[in-house]
Amino acid sequence: MGYWKSKVVPRMKKLFEKSPAKKEVVEEEKPREVEVVEEVVVKTEEPAKEGETKPEEIIATGEKEIEIVEEKKEEAKPVEVPVLAAAEEKKPAVEEEKKTAPVEEKKPAVEEEKKPAVEEKKPVEEEKKEVVAAVPVAETPSTKAPETPVVETPAKAPETPAAAPQKA
């Protein structure tokens, strides 16, 4: 207890003596922060007033945009004729696709040649799997389990010598 009173208690008192001084300094800084916060609030209120006028402008522009969209819809009706012209332009593209189709037919022929080679490899892998599977089965303890009952049969062997003296 002497160590506690002489070393620990005085250090704790020093810690608490320093903290009130720091708290006073922090308290002085808080009013400054509040002023800054108030300024920020005032600044945010002013743009809000400006923002209120902006939505009215946006609404007005929105009506103009609606009118423009309606005008574009009217213009879209005569545009249907160029769409038919675009369909005619697509027909030559279909012919070009037919020309490229024979090239695609050649590629599958090459792929077909590769497939038999892959098929030949697969049976080899299956044979390996079968061989590997057969080896562990022979070594498993389950095959040794039937041998254990065979060991128990010699326990019956003493009974047979007892039967042998009866014959003699």
Curated annotation (Swiss-Prot):
Subunit structure: Binds microtubules. Interacts with calcium ion Ca(2+), calmodulin and some phosphatidylinositol phosphates (PtdInsPs) such as phosphatidylinositol 3,5-bisphosphate [PtdIns(3,5)P(2)], PtdIns(4,5)P(2) and PtdIns(3,4,5)P(3).
Sequence repeat residues: 26-30, 69-73, 94-99, 103-107, 110-115, 118-122, 124-129
Keyword Coiled coil: yes
Entry protein name: Plasma membrane-associated cation-binding protein 2
The keyword Calcium appears for this protein: yes
Region named Disordered: 88-168
Lipidation (N-myristoyl glycine): G2
Function: May be involved in intracellular signaling through interaction with PtdInsPs and calmodulin (CaM); may keep PtdInsPs attached to the plasma membrane until Ca(2+)-CaM reaches a competitive concentration subsequent to an increase triggered by a stimulus, thus leading to PtdInsPs release and subsequent activation of InsPs-dependent signaling cascade. Binds to microtubules and inhibits tubulin polymerization. Regulates directional cell growth and cortical microtubule organization by destabilizing microtubules (e.g. in cotyledon pavement cells).
GO annotation, biological process: cell morphogenesis; cortical microtubule organization; leaf senescence; negative regulation of microtubule polymerization; regulation of cell shape; response to abscisic acid; response to arsenic-containing substance; response to cold
Effect of G2A: Loss of plasma membrane localization, but accumulates into the cytoplasm
Tissue specificity: Mostly expressed in the expanding cells, specifically in roots (except in root tips) and flowers (at protein level). Also detected in cotyledons, hypocotyls and trichome stalks.
Molecular function GO labels: 1-phosphatidylinositol binding; calmodulin binding; microtubule binding; phosphatidylinositol phosphate binding; signaling receptor activity
Transmembrane residue ranges: none
Low complexity composition bias: residue spans: 152-168
Primary site of residence: membrane
Cofactor: Cu(2+)
Biased composition annotated in UniProt, kind: Basic and acidic residues: 88-131
Membrane topology: Lipid-anchor
GO cellular component terms, A-Z: cytoplasm; microtubule; plasma membrane; pollen tube
Top-level taxon in the UniProt lineage: Eukaryota
Region (7 X 5 AA approximate repeats of V-E-E-K-K): 26-129
PANTHER family associated with the record: GENOME ASSEMBLY, CHROMOSOME: A09, PLASMA MEMBRANE-ASSOCIATED CATION-BINDING PROTEIN 1
Factors inducing expression: By arsenate As (V). Accumulates in response to abscisic acid (ABA), gibberellic acid (GA), cold, and drought stresses. Induced by various salt treatments such as NaCl, KCl, MgCl(2), MnCl(2) and ZnCl(2). Expressed during leaf senescence.
Stretches of the chain forming a coiled coil according to its record: 56-77
